[in-house]
């Protein structure tokens, strides 16, 4: 592998600009070689002066890069030292509190189940758990910094070696010895000491001396590009997707030849439509995950996932394919129910019952950690006013806004099984056209409108909670106003529908109000998508016209196509209203809704790419590469002390004027000496060397 590719694959994305600009140096060297005057047409002194002038410029650029790397490394190392001292203080405090309350100094002797502990013991248990997670994330940050150190040194060695080869000189090697090999970022070995001390602390204080268990907890995933999925996972993805395609073809043929024309298929479509949208969403989320990894958008950090254990795009494809097969089989079983002893209405219950069981399955199988993370996230979303709202919380609530049809179809299914289904008929899900009452899919009894507002309500109260926590009216209250327009839009749609059915004279009043609020909502959300969520139309965009100063994805066309797509699908409702209000075709509203619901899921899929890109660039601006695990809250005294430390002569000053350093943990100058500190072991992370000159 060429070193440029190796460097690109192994850098920490949030620190990209702080690495050696290897490709820029290569371009400088090759340009100088191509533009050099030929010895055949000019004298030798002119050629020497040309290369001497180039070398002066080249080494000046090297000095700037070296200064940048030294400064950044020193800043991150100082941050790591402060963080380590804080974690040691918190650990010592937890151990002291544990000793006072239980009379036991080690964690080994605390074997009571969590639900048998007192409130104080529960708090201590939670603190220890948080400390384990905090040390794990801290260790990851140390490995990233060590990787930064090794990659930059290798980069300087490679580019200076290439310099000497092209210019046929040894001045590059001399410059490396005189400058790089004595640079603080290379000579400083404190990072290795911190790694060893962290391993020792976790082993002796948190894992009862079990080094194997400690290293399993601290294990860092391979740095670099996404690792290939296990062969069996890849096999299952291909198998499931192939079966799903074949079953879909079978479904189309069965629908053509098996369905009876005197039967209404809409109850069946409404019941199975939500399942299809969920499968589509999972599949597109897999594509999102793949795209983020390829572009270097660190979605693992953004969603605060465990970097050591999380679902890849292959796993999401596998789940989507498996559920897709079950969905097709269930629908096929409904078509062929007349020749079986099982009534039609059993199959949807079996399908969705299995999906629910798959999600809440308490055994540690079938991606237990990921399912548990999703359940916790769903709980936080539906109890939004009582928790601080993180990125993953409002991201999931935004997804629910695009999946509102699933909630409405779930409400329809419950209503249909409760009020409309004829349990004594084997074809209960395919009633006669004359017998379809049509109560459940209308706004008549009010529940449907409430269900339609639930996703917008969740985001609305999340915005209010964020305003309460930050006291910032913009953007949180303004964003809440965006979601509040949905309430008016749904209300007037419901009033228009019910008044139209009853033939009231004021029907058109509600129709016009519905249209007005639909326009307001669409314009509001479109502007917010493009400007706030995606960060586009930045006045400092420079050559990236109508975009932003920095973009992650390689082609500008992606952004322009996404803008056009968002505009079209945000106003697709105009087509729906035009058709339903002018045509006499029965079930025209259901037909349009069935067509546009998957398109809305697709719109959210595109939105996800650019929303996470914008969040990733925010993390890059703050050089945030690991999760901030809060062990103890930061109070006013701690904040003052932190600012004093930042202003000390031996401290590292913030180089970004518009940014203030914030830590979620208490800061203390006291650094207690734990027993584990005398047992530190050296740990090294090997960076693949690519010494062959052909590979540079």
From Swiss-Prot:
Q: What is the effect of changing residue 570 to A/C/L?
A: Decreases phosphate efflux
Q: What is the effect of changing residue 219 to E?
A: Increases phosphate efflux
Q: Which disease is it linked to?
A: Basal ganglia calcification, idiopathic, 6: A form of basal ganglia calcification, an autosomal dominant condition characterized by symmetric calcification in the basal ganglia and other brain regions. Affected individuals can either be asymptomatic or show a wide spectrum of neuropsychiatric symptoms, including parkinsonism, dystonia, tremor, ataxia, dementia, psychosis, seizures, and chronic headache. Serum levels of calcium, phosphate, alkaline phosphatase and parathyroid hormone are normal.
**Organism of this sequence:** Homo sapiens (Human)
Q: Where in the cell is it found?
A: Cell membrane
Q: Please describe, based on the UniProt annotation, the reported consequence of changing residue 218 to S.
A: In IBGC6; phosphate efflux is impaired; present at the plasma membrane
| Outcome of swapping residue 238 to F | Monomeric; decreases phosphate efflux
Residue(s) carrying Phosphoserine: 668
Q: What does this protein do?
A: Inorganic ion transporter that mediates phosphate ion export across plasma membrane. Plays a major role in phosphate homeostasis, preventing intracellular phosphate accumulation and possible calcium phosphate precipitation, ultimately preserving calcium signaling. Binds inositol hexakisphosphate (Ins6P) and similar inositol polyphosphates, such as 5-diphospho-inositol pentakisphosphate (5-InsP7), which are important intracellular signaling molecules involved in regulation of phosphate flux.
Site (Gating residue for phosphate transport): which residue positions?
573
Tissue specificity of this protein: Widely expressed. Detected in spleen, lymph node, thymus, leukocytes, bone marrow, heart, kidney, pancreas and skeletal muscle.
Phenotype upon changing residue 140 to P: In IBGC6; phosphate efflux is impaired; present at the plasma membrane
**Record-listed Phosphothreonine modification sites:** 690
By sequence similarity, the record places it as follows:
Belongs to the SYG1 (TC 2.A.94) family.
Q: Which GO terms describe its cellular component?
A: plasma membrane
The primary location reported for this protein is membrane
| Result of changing residue 603 to A | Decreases phosphate efflux
Q: What does changing residue 145 to P do?
A: In IBGC6; dominant negative; phosphate efflux is impaired; loss of localization to the plasma membrane
Catalyses: phosphate(in) = phosphate(out)
Q: Which Pfam family name is an example for this entry?
A: SPX
Name-wise, this protein is: Solute carrier family 53 member 1
Highest taxon in the source lineage: Eukaryota
What happens after mutating residue 136 to N?
Answer: In IBGC6; phosphate efflux is impaired; present at the plasma membrane
Positions of phosphate binding = 398, 401, 482-483, 570, 603-604
Read off the domain note: The SPX domain plays a role in the regulation of phosphate flux. Inositol hexakisphosphate (Ins6P) is bound between two SPX domains of the homodimer. The SPX domain has high affinity for inositol polyphosphates and its affinity for inorganic phosphate is two to three orders of magnitude lower.
| Gene coding for it | XPR1
Result of changing residue 604 to A: Decreases phosphate efflux
